[in-house]
Amino acid sequence: VNKKRREANQLNARIDRLIAEEIERARKRAQEEARREAAARKKADAKDKTSSGTGTVARPKSEPLDAFTMSKADRELSGSFVANRGKLPMPISGPYIITSRYGQYAVEGLRNVKLDNKGIDIQGKPGAQARAIFDGKVAAVFQLNGLFNVLIRHGNYISVYCNLSSASVKSGDTVSTKQAIG
């Protein structure tokens, strides 16, 4: 039980770190996009001033960036993801069983021992493939304890696929709904 708990904590810590890094990259992309838009507006304003030669119209200043802002593409993808809530496909092809549900659970045969699961555990038959639940971009692929783990960004959302025997995608790849990832 301690080994399983230690491995789960190690995996969760790695995933949390990668998600934090992905959020920071998205924040920087959004800031860069906002900077480019501001520069384009400034250039257009300067062009308007020189062409009209009289009077200026004050444009409202753009709002300051929030702690986490998204690019336009990420906002659109997030909206699509939310709109499909409850309609997303299973992240595995073929027959499967759910071996562990989300949240705390008691370990069979051990009194007063509880573990916490941050997702659901799905076991497929040999040859089953893990697949993306929605369009997105692969944020990270890493190996831990000999198994592959994949994080896919869907705008403001990230889906995590753990304990895969192989990975058929790499960081930066664009994936579509139901595409095999491992």
Q: Which residues does each predicted region cover?
A:
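Short C-terminal domain-edge/linker segments immediately following a structured domain
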Residues: 126-131, 152-153, 164-170, 181-182
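Extracytoplasmic/periplasmic cell wall- or extracellular glycan-interacting regions that localize
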Residues: 2-140, 146, 153, 160
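Generic structural signal for buried aliphatic residues
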Residues: 96, 136, 175-181
